[in-house]
Amino acid sequence: RVICTNMLNGALDKASCHIRLRHTKSIKEKLELGAQVLKVACSHALDAQELYRHLTTIKMSDEDVYKYLCELQLTPAEIERINQYDPNKGYARLVARDYRLLEAVEISSRKANQLYNMMDYYNDGIGQKDICGTAWGAYNAVTGFYCNVANLEGEKRMNSLVWGSANNNMNKALNAVVAYAS
């Protein structure tokens, strides 16, 4: 219970979840705009929830996951070289970091390590036990890699996740898994 302004200011300074509103001339319009933004966000959240639930029903074999991850991380030329070198097991060998394959098809160890870490997250990541073998599990491995495994820290990490390459790769991963599910 707030008794005085000092107590209110002290409580607000220590609070972790609060919104301050200044009563300016445009407060009414800003509140209405905020309500519209919240409605759009809630609608988007419901649509996303429905999509993610659908992805949990789509089965993906390990070979499909290898191909999915490789198609996200590699260039078309690299994919073509893998398919020419070993059309049957190329993706699996790449994800397992077969160094002879890496050298033969000229793929950097950085990309191979990313693929290996994504597959490792797919098999053993947080919460993956129940969704392994599904399209949702494959997509979650990509997002989990960028959010939990990638080596960026601090502001660089946040910028990458929100606006940068990690965000672009996660959007690309979502589009690819939705295309697979269709």
Each language-model region and where it sits:
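Intrinsically disordered, low-complexity regions enriched in serine/threonine
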Residues: 2-182
